[in-house]
UniProtKB/Swiss-Prot annotation:
UniProt keyword terms in alphabetical order: Cytoplasm, Hydrolase, Metal-binding, Nucleotide-binding
Full protein name: 5'/3'-nucleotidase SurE
Entry function: Nucleotidase with a broad substrate specificity as it can dephosphorylate various ribo- and deoxyribonucleoside 5'-monophosphates and ribonucleoside 3'-monophosphates with highest affinity to 3'-AMP. Also hydrolyzes polyphosphate (exopolyphosphatase activity) with the preference for short-chain-length substrates (P20-25). Might be involved in the regulation of dNTP and NTP pools, and in the turnover of 3'-mononucleotides produced by numerous intracellular RNases (T1, T2, and F) during the degradation of various RNAs.
Subcellular location: Cytoplasm
Reactions catalysed according to its record: a ribonucleoside 5'-phosphate + H2O = a ribonucleoside + phosphate; a ribonucleoside 3'-phosphate + H2O = a ribonucleoside + phosphate; [phosphate](n) + H2O = [phosphate](n-1) + phosphate + H(+)
Gene Ontology terms for molecular function: 3'-nucleotidase activity; 5'-nucleotidase activity; exopolyphosphatase activity; metal ion binding; nucleotide binding
Pfam families per UniProt: SurE (PF01975)
Designated gene of the protein: surE
Species assigned in the record: Escherichia coli O8 (strain IAI1)
EC identifiers of the protein: 3.1.3.5, 3.1.3.6, 3.6.1.11
Cystine residue pairs: none
Cofactor binding note of this UniProt entry: Binds 1 divalent metal cation per subunit.
Keyword Nucleotide-binding: yes
Known cofactor(s): a divalent metal cation
Length: 253
């Protein structure tokens, strides 16, 4: 199995390094990752400037100022030959649950892999300690995919509790929960008296029902949520069409 491995925490982050070491026990792994932390970069792509890469002695490649999406795009289309069989993103330091997937560079890297036609996994740890647990879970899923490919056309967003492996209760297939809107902004002043702003933490859990990713991880289960690239709200199409007809938009300007 040939694996393109990326992340949004940066090429030197413990999550990606732990996962790369574990995956290399049974797979051909090419790391292509940002040279720095790009958390929250979502699906952004660098279009107005060139991208420079640096290759380390072990073969890992850092993309200077690159986003996670840049890294997967370059990895698939230029840097990994032959091309990968699958794209894996992670292990992220911290969860990507509920609305987090909108902002997550970890999920975005997997989405780019799927958009380019490859199966893809996004892997996140609900903490910063037991990366070995998340790596073991990821390897188990990848070995299963080798035996029997999963042809859903979706990415798998995997969130792992920050627990020793023997304390993981199992796996649940879940849906995304949701958070309350975030509203915190943290102002500071620089030495010249100018105001700086920091984006605050995410909102608290809003929808954390028993079938959600939030609930699974809180209860000690690995959460696997199938995600797709299509953002169309199919169930709302008729509602919007009826509304346009009722208000006369499109018949007169």
């Amino acid at each position: 199995m040939r694996i393109l491995l990326s992340n949004d925490d940066g090429v030197h982050a413990p999550g990606i390094q732990t996962l790369a070491k574990t995956l290399r026990e049974f797979a051909d792994v090419q790391v292509v990752a940002p040279d720095r932390n790009r958390s929250g970069a979502s699906n952004s792509l660098t279009l107005e400037s060139s991208l420079r890469t640096f290759t380390f002695e072990n073969g890992d490649i850092a993309v200077q100022m690159g986003t996670p999406t840049d890294c997967v795009y370059l990895g698939v289309n230029a840097l990994m030959r032959p091309r990968p069989d699958i794209v894996v993103s992670g292990i992220n330091a911290g969860p990507n649950l509920g609305d987090d997937v909108i902002y997550s560079g970890t999920v975005a890297a997997a989405m780019e892999g799927r958009h380019l036609g490859f199966p893809a996994l996004a892997v996140s740890l609900d903490g910063h300690k037991h990366y070995d647990t998340a790596a073991a879970v990821t390897c188990s899923i990848l070995r299963a995919l080798c035996k029997e490919p999963l042809r859903t056309g979706r990415i798998l967003n995997i969130n792992v509790p920050d627990l020793p492996l023997d304390q993981i209760k199992g796996i649940r297939v879940t849906r995304c929960g949701s958070r309350h809107p975030a509203d915190q902004v943290i102002p500071q002043q620089d030495p010249r008296g100018n105001t700086l702003y920091w984006i605050g933490p995410p909102g608290g859990k809003c929808d954390a029902g028993p079938d959600t990713d939030f609930a699974a991880v809180d209860e000690g289960y690995v959460s696997i949520t199938p995600l797709h690239v299509d953002l169309t709200a199919h169930s709302a199409q008729d509602v919007v069409s009826d509304w346009l007809n009722s208000v006369g938009v499109g018949t007169q300007w």
